[in-house]
Amino acid sequence: MVRAPEPELIEKMRTTPLAGLASSLGIDIDAWLPIASSPLPVTMRLTPRRHDIDWTREQLIAMGGKRIEWLSTIEAWQMPFPKGDIPDDAKAMLMILHETGRITRQEAVSMLPPVVLEPAKDSLVMDTCAAPGSKATQLAEAIPDGLVLANEPSSGRLNMLATNRGRLGLANMLIMQHDGRHIGRMPEPGIEGIVVDAPCTGTATTRKNRDLWWGWSPKDGRSMFQLQTDIAYRAAQLLVPGGLMVYSTCSIDPTENEAAVCEILRRCPWLELVNIDANRLFPGLVVHHGIDNWEILDEEANPIEWTGEIPRLPGLKEEMLNPLIRGEEAPPLSYTIRVHPHDNNTGGFYVALFRHIPEATPEGIAKSMILKRKLMREPVELPRQNPNRHTINPADSELVKTICDKWGIDASAFSWWHRGKRTNIASPMTLSRLYHPTVQNNKGDFWPGDAFHPLRIVHVGQPSFTDNKGFWRPRGEAMELLRPHITKNLVDVDETTLIDMLKGNVPLVEDFPVEIETGSSILRCGEHLAPVWVAARVSFMVSEKERDVLRLKLGVEVGGEEE
């Protein structure tokens, strides 16, 4: 059910420049306004391949959740309540499911770009503007045998990205920190798939940001144009021939959408637009094709008649005008898609799909890796970078052996990384595609292999083990990732023992019903696994929210009493 604002407020919104922008696009304002000004429904992505995914589905159904049918290639759900009006019991349950990595709260339209990209399951892909991480983690879930480079320039937002990676236990994600316009050089041949979810004015996000109604004017979209196209240009330089790149925004402004696409094609003649098959990818979703005849708007969003001269408006440049005005043949902008809130009870979104034309680059590598001038001498090995606090190194073989012997893990299933008291596990592709190869600079010299430089990699894979007084214990958030691989130090207990501990009892070792070694172990009760630390007592080493999941599954009230 959609709860629209009072009629008086809607009438005020009708007079805003934002409504003028929508009207200039041919949007039915009477149908659009009540939805575009109402709260969004709560939506989420269900984490695939978890052992208890059926249990999670049961919780969503019990709250009145329903599958989003038009997202047919992933499992997404919509709740029967809006974001600002979640019942208390549902709010508590959603928090438990989200924080333990069973769901990811995410707008439905935000899930479009990774689906449009359709990455191969063993490919190397990149998200250029990844925080807070909903699309990057969706990509990682889509390519379990591949690798995601998640880039974020802001340190604060990068921490959110790392939190979401850790919450979901993803070993196939690397987090790096670059200005998206200047992402570092990397090994040949480049990247197979890229998502550029560009920074934008968010004019399609009015359902969660009401300030836009009163704060937006056309100059805001123009102010984003250069940044958006610069980020996309750098991404296109890193794309392998035949590779795909998605450009997307949560804006309805053609300056940030179709005009940006035209500029990307002008600057990147090796790219072509690909027709997005929305009927196949999103069956039942109402979409609109991209346009090629957008109008010039003044600061009140009133259309300005073209007189042959560019109007003197804040930030307006020739490349922001539609191709018909510029006297140019328009690219097939109808290949791109727009989603409007009132058609599907969603937010709004714009998506374009590009392909690196293989014939445009017979060298078979990304454009940034082709020397502008042939090197007339032997290439020189460049000096290694000095290590710093962010430097991540492969774990020592003895350390890996210690962990794998303790827990019965096949070391070859992962690449192993060490920093401080943590050991991370990552996709083996991390070594073969990014760490071992040499990297050429723009002069033809090269940095030696066995380093990530010049990429500024901040986090590799999933933190999975912590050194605790000489014992390498598994981290609670990594348990789902480790579950299929751990074969030793699993201590079987009955439900009574587990329930007793979930009620708050921390038993002495001598009172524990089964023999258990000092240090780190994992309690197993049927399908339930719980890491513990054993000293004088046996103590849980999992988060309180994960304990709440165990309580719910075993019939123990989250408050501590048995149901």
Question: Where is each model-derived feature located?
Answer:
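Polybasic, low-complexity RNA-engagement segments
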Residues: M1-M63, W306, L316-N322, G327-P331, ...
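Conserved class I S-adenosyl-L-methionine
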Residues: D122-A131
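Short beta-strand element of Class I
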Residues: D145-L149
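Conserved SAM-binding loop of SAM-dependent methyltransferases across substrates and taxa
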Residues: P132-P144
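Mobile active-site "lid"/loop adjacent to the S-adenosyl-L-methionine
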Residues: I143, G156, P189-R234, L239, ...
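Conserved Class I S-adenosyl-L-methionine
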Residues: K219-S223, E258-F282, I291, E295-E300
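Class I SAM-dependent transferase core
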Residues: S72-P119, L161
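S-adenosyl-L-methionine
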Residues: N151-P189, V196
